[in-house]
Each structure stands twice: as C-alpha cells, then as structure tokens.
C-alpha cells in the first residue's frame, strides 16, 4: 500500500514538473511579443542617436526636452510590464535587471542647466544607454529562448543603423 502511494505521488510530481517547461515557454513568448510592440520606438531611438550625433543638425532646447520625454515614456511603458505576473524566475529576474538598468537613462538625460552643447551630449548619452541596455536585454532573452528550445524564430530584432 505504501509503495502504491509513493508511486502515485512520484507520478504526479513528474507530471507536474513536465508542464513547467511548457508554461515557461509560453510566458517567454508572451513577454517577447509585448516587447515586440516597442519596435517602432526602437527605430525612433536609432533616429534620435543619428540626429543628436550629427553636429551639422541644429538641436534646440525644446528638441532635447522632447527626447527626454520620449526616454521617460519609454521607461514608464517598460515598467508597466509587471514582473509579479511572471512565474518564470529567470525571466522575472532578467526583466527586473533590465528595468533597473534602463531607468538610469532618466538620470543621464536630466537638464543640468549647462550650455546647450553639453546638454545635447548628456541626452545623446542617455539615448545610447537606452539602446545599449535594450540590445543587451534582447540578447539575454535570446539566450533564454534557446535554452527553452522554442522552435519559433526569436521575434526581437534591433533595427539596423
């Protein structure tokens, strides 16, 4: 009798563990599709980098304020993806790390009251920080994608320069 109960418990345990991988795959694919919605904004990041790095283009204080608002909105929307709802632990940790790192762009872009060319440099650094951290996050998600052996192609591709 004890042996039968033990075998039943073992069978239930193995069955329950088997579904965890599939649930994590689905969660990872859903998360990637949420980030896929940021593709247009990622292209805008590349455009902002080109514009801010080109000294032949004039940039006003209002332009810099618009870029700061773009950065703040991007970060705010990333933060709206609630990590509490993520059951896949490594994905949750990756997301939390991404949010903490990408939030630093707000600090880099802050108006310090310096001359416009210095402010332009600060905002450019902030936008590049956003790009760098988002690319790194996509790479981390690609690794998780490969580890989970998801057959669909990885959907997150950074726009070409």
What are these regions (language model features)?
Residues 18-20, 78:
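Short, charge-rich amphipathic alpha-helices with coiled-coil/heptad character
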Residues 71-99, 112:
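Short, solvent-exposed, charged loop/turn and helix-capping segments
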Residues 1-6:
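Bacterial N-terminal signal peptides that target proteins for export
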Residues 21-65, 104-161:
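C-terminal amphipathic alpha-helix
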Residues 13-16:
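C-terminal motif of bacterial Sec signal peptides marking the signal peptidase cleavage site
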């Amino acid at each position: 009798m004890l042996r039968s109960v033990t075998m039943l418990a073992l069978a239930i345990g193995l069955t329950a563990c088997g579904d965890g991988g599939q649930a994590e795959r689905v969660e990872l694919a859903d998360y990637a599709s949420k980030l896929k919605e940021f593709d247009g904004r990622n292209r805008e990041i590349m455009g902002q980098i080109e514009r801010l790095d080109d000294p032949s283009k004039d940039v006003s204080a209002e332009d810099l304020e618009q870029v700061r608002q773009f950065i703040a909105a991007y970060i705010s929307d990333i933060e709206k993806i609630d990590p509490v709802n993520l059951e896949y632990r490594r994905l949750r940790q990756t997301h939390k790390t991404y949010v903490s790192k990408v939030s630093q762009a707000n600090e880099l872009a802050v108006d310090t009251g310096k001359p416009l060319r210095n402010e332009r440099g600060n905002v450019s650094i902030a936008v590049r920080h956003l790009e760098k951290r988002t690319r790194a996050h996509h790479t981390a998600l690609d690794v998780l994608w490969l580890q989970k052996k998801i057959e669909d192609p990885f959907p997150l591709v950074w726009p070409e320069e």
